[in-house]
Amino acid sequence: STAVWLVDAPDLRAQAESGSPGRGGGRGGSPRPRELAAWLQIAADGTVTAFTGKVEVGQNIRTSLTQAIAEELPTPLSSIKLVMADTRLVPLDGGTVGSRTTPDMNLQLRKVAATAREALLDLAAMHWSVERATLTAADGRIRHPASGRTIGFGELTKGEKLVVNVSDRIALKPASQWTIAGTSVPKVDGHT
């Protein structure tokens, strides 16, 4: 079980931590931040905001990256807002070059979403004082089937950031079990 802390984050500014292990963008550059909140926030209403330095220029990465997050978290596509290329907010990740977004950023955001999922399961187990293994996550909610209890991701976090590091060793959903990623969905619109 991972220690998970909730901290009020009214003005989150994603930025790389100096001295962190890893590389940005897959081709050198600054290290990627390890803190989950640099990549993903869950608002009290359940809206998931994810951050990437990648730029949508017609290659439809907004949709594919949103699908990757929805698959691993798991939450509806409609609840995800992807902030792209806002240098005030997003982690430094080496830019949109060399056809690296899908192999690099898709994998990174899957790890981010899976780490968030595991942290939410840990929080719910503590919240309800139940065994973590008895919980499931689906559709933006944690469920305890034995008692019928359910709680939304936003209700659980109350809009506070999850303070946990993204794990490179996190278990990711195998492609054979995907129901969102890799499927045909309407293009995700970047305008709000």
Predicted regions and their residues:
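Cofactor-binding beta-sheet edge motifs in enzyme active sites
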Residues: 1-8, 12-192
